[in-house]
Amino acid sequence: MHYMVIERFKDAPAIYRRLDEKGRIMPEGLNYVSSWIDHNLKTCWQVMETEDFVLLERWIDNWKDLMEFEIIPVRTSAEVVDLIKRKDH
């Protein structure tokens, strides 16, 4: 399952220092897909993938001192098309 993770940065320089020193600090089974950061270094929109939501919670525990999180389960457009087609039949 994919999740849109919206991160609201408290301290961008500290976040990037930790990222440089420790990496993403993700448990096995949680996969980083891609991310986009606004020009003001205040918000990051990140797509993560896992079959176990608990892994996402563990990852958040490693970063929650430096940012606030909003987690939204998402589907690809292709998945939605297939879902709608199945419901129509």
Q: What residue spans do the PLM features occupy?
A:
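Conserved, structured core segments of small domains
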Residues: 1-89
